[in-house]
Amino acid sequence: MRKSYRIKKELEFQKVFETRNSFANKKFVVYVMDKPEQPHFRVGISVGKKIGNAVMRNYTKRRIRQSILEFKPLLRQDVDFLVIARPQASGLPMNEVKQQLEHVFKLAGLFASKQSEEE
């Protein structure tokens, strides 16, 4: 995923957190902020220190990033969102990560509707 698709700065993370528009399941929490002027979505990924050592945290982030990349054509383009991994997300197989993220993205309404794809 290109850098233009990522949220990196702490101030940008805080703006999304402050919207308090969150959706969660047992493995992930997603915060969403609408940004209609934006040409494409941006994502921030946070994996806390409760998830293993640095190797395990980076492994988890890579799996989240790969899942988002696979969902990219289906996602709304006018949002910033943060994905926060809960400790239960540690060591999940790729198909489970993708399934759990799909569930929480549906709750958050991050998938573009069929009508907007046809326009």
Swiss-Prot record:
EC numbers listed for it are 3.1.26.5
The UniProt catalytic activity note for this protein reads:
Endonucleolytic cleavage of RNA, removing 5'-extranucleotides from tRNA precursor
- Record note on quaternary structure: Consists of a catalytic RNA component (M1 or rnpB) and a protein subunit.
> Which PANTHER family does the record match to this protein?
RIBONUCLEASE P PROTEIN COMPONENT
Q: What does this protein do?
A: RNaseP catalyzes the removal of the 5'-leader sequence from pre-tRNA to produce the mature 5'-terminus. It can also cleave other RNA substrates such as 4.5S RNA. The protein component plays an auxiliary but essential role in vivo by binding to the 5'-leader sequence and broadening the substrate specificity of the ribozyme.
Q: Which family does it belong to?
A: Belongs to the RnpA family.
Q: What is this protein called?
A: Ribonuclease P protein component
Please tell me the species this chain comes from: Pediococcus pentosaceus (strain ATCC 25745 / CCUG 21536 / LMG 10740 / 183-1w)
| Lineage of the organism | Bacteria, Bacillati, Bacillota, Bacilli, Lactobacillales
**Encoding gene, per UniProt annotation:** rnpA
